[in-house]
Amino acid sequence: MKVAVEGCCHGELDKIYESISYLENKDGVKVDLLLCCGDFQAVRNEGDMKCMAVPAKYRHMQTFYKYYSGEKKAPVLTIFIGGNHEASNHLQELPYGGWVAPNIYYLGYAGVIRYKGVRIGGLSGIFKSHDFKKGHFEFPPYNPETLRSVYHIRNIDVFKLKQIKMPIDIFMTHDWPRGIYHYGNTNALLRQKKFLRQEVESSTLGSPAAADLLEHLQPSYWFSAHLHVKFAALMQHEAKNNTAPKITKFLSLDKCLPHRDFLQIVEVADRPGSSEQLEYDPEWLAILKATDNLQKPTCNFWNPPQDNGLHSRWDFSASEEAMMEVVSDLSGDLCIPENFSLTVPPYDPSQPQPHALPAYSTNPQTTELCATLNLTDIYILAGQSGQIYGERGGKGATEEEDEEDSTGSADEPSDFPSDTSGLSSSYNPDEITIEDEWEEEEDGGVGCGEGKGMDAVVPEGQVGSQDSDRDSSPQRETAKRLILPAPCAKPKTEAPLHSLPRLSLPPPSACVSQGSSEEEGAFTAARVPKRTSGETTQSSAGQTGGTPQIKRRNQSIYTAVEDEESDS
């Protein structure tokens, strides 16, 4: 089958689909599938833009809202992962993946699905060592720290992916696997991106977590983006168990701009007789069920179970029996239901609302999947955790939880001791760099981290001390039995969707990233400091004038001709 691969989307769906149509007519082919490697920007309305980690000058509605509202429908089945410029409040509704619009599917924090028998997996976000060992604790309204940390990948998701034993055909990450540049034309890469030389020569460019997954999964194809350059590589893996060594074809593509290599069609062998619809992957769903109790919505460090004598179980790979149980849970039907529904009002160009506050809601797709497989909605779990932590004075966790979550972590080195992701001295002038390049201004509009607009659909579940057994914790039980409003019957409706129940939000996350807001330090194994109630009060008082606007240092770098072209 013909698979179109896109680098960074940046919300330019109209242009991408037009480019695919042009290639189809030019080459006489029919594209079966589009894969987008992050920075998708599924922005539904003006409120979503305030939950996207880009400076205000780069916040543009683009064209996704047309596909969300039903004005248009994607002409090609589209699958995407998240990057570091996303409408995070939208994607957090779908931690296990789901439809963001008809015919457009998000893979979630991590996921594996099937199309025409081809196994397609992905990992959303980018790697930052200081957040890697934390749980998915972020919950809107975001503060300036969580607005960035929310898209950092976590070891729980990497751990789940490392339980996969069956072959993967295609895998996607936003940032590159560390070291992959040594398997392609490195000199040509450095001629195009001279600022990468230091990190390439020191083998510190890219994600060590992705490199770990590349070694474990050894997929046939690996697609990435992030660096805004086309680069291909061919990696031969070491032979295992007396079998022939596997080969991974790596391809990274540019962002969607004129005269840039942002799209390429790849021919992938499908499996005759396989379903023409997207399908769940039984092995992956069995892994999700097995690891459900490992979810910890905390900003304290957590290490996955290991065969070190401290854990009763460390292998969460899927047995044949577990996979058959998943198939039974789905009543034998692996086809992913086309159950998209609106959860917030779409953008209306005739009635712009530039001061609209972000809206937050649970998603019926996630609720349905969790009910079917008895999974925990990570988004709700984080929200419940935020409520509990907020009522404890914003300290982030009790002493018991802190002790439990940091066991085996506080005194251990990083999983990737060579990681220098916080020490990168190079910058990509072609990238809208957010990490630690923000400076505050005195005046500013309302942002997602301000803590206003507390009208999200969030469960009010029982609040109390957590038991040591996480299976019986109030927040987990509430997360599993939350009853959602009925989804919209049509993709486009006259009603403004204000009929959705509105419940109180927890306060903004009290956890503070270990990296400085000015310059990220190297990864340390120190325990995450807690914020005292006094600090929380002071922070809240400082926000009464509205969340400060953000600007970058070195603005002159971003006035390149290509950016002017993109603005036009």
From Swiss-Prot:
Subcellular location: Nucleus
Cofactor needs: Fe(2+); Zn(2+); Mn(2+)
Activity regulation as described: Active in presence of diverse metals including Fe(2+), Zn(2+), Mn(2+). Also activated by Ca(2+). Binds two metal cations in two adjacent alpha and beta metal-binding pockets.
Biased composition regions of type Acidic residues, renumbered to the chain: 432-444
Basic and acidic residues composition bias: residue spans: 467-480
Modified residues (Phosphoserine): S568
Keywords, sorted A to Z: Hydrolase, Iron, Manganese, Metal-binding, mRNA processing, Nucleus, Phosphoprotein, Zinc
Molecular functions (GO terms): metal ion binding; RNA lariat debranching enzyme activity
SUPFAM superfamilies cross-referenced by the UniProt entry: Metallo-dependent phosphatases
Bound cofactor: record note: Binds 2 divalent metal cations per subunit.
Annotated Gene Ontology cellular component terms: nucleus
E.C. code: 3.1.4.-
Listed Low complexity bias regions: 534-549
Protein origin, superkingdom: Eukaryota
Pfam families: DBR1 (PF05011), Metallophos (PF00149)
Bias (Polar residues) ranges: 417-428
Binding site for a divalent metal cation 2: D39, N84, H174, H226
Name of this protein: Lariat debranching enzyme
Lineage: Eukaryota, Metazoa, Chordata, Craniata, Vertebrata
Record gene name: dbr1
